[in-house]
Amino acid sequence: ADDKVVYAYMPRIVKYYLGEEMIIPNVPTYLCAEDDDRAYVLEHLDELVVKAANESGGYGMLVGPHATALEREEFAARITANPRNYIAQPTLALSRVPTIVDGHFEGRHVDLRPYILYGRDIYVLPGGLTRVALKKGSLVVNSSQGG
């Protein structure tokens, strides 16, 4: 599993090591271990995606706009009890593509992860890794959930 806390530091990491701003902006990432960030997250749970900082698989996360009031309340208690374990990000509008589901086409959310090779020259490979949210309406595009 990767540590999602690093997402919050990416603009500073790029600036420090490369001496330049990021070309493609990073998704804003709120660290629940930070008092101001945690206060913002708790006030905006209905707008944010909250993830465990050191876990993978797309499980145990809260997609605020799709969560019930009770689910948001339970997550607020988890965040308060163990703030270091959580980060939050805005809910993104993912692309949709036709996907074969049960023998016919249906629209599903996807994400695309490009690959770049670095050596004497830098190459952006054509295509990339595309992951799909197979559950209708889901925003969770994770290979461990069939995507």
Residue ranges and their predicted role:
Residues 1-145:
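Domain-scale recognition of functional cores that engage charged ligands
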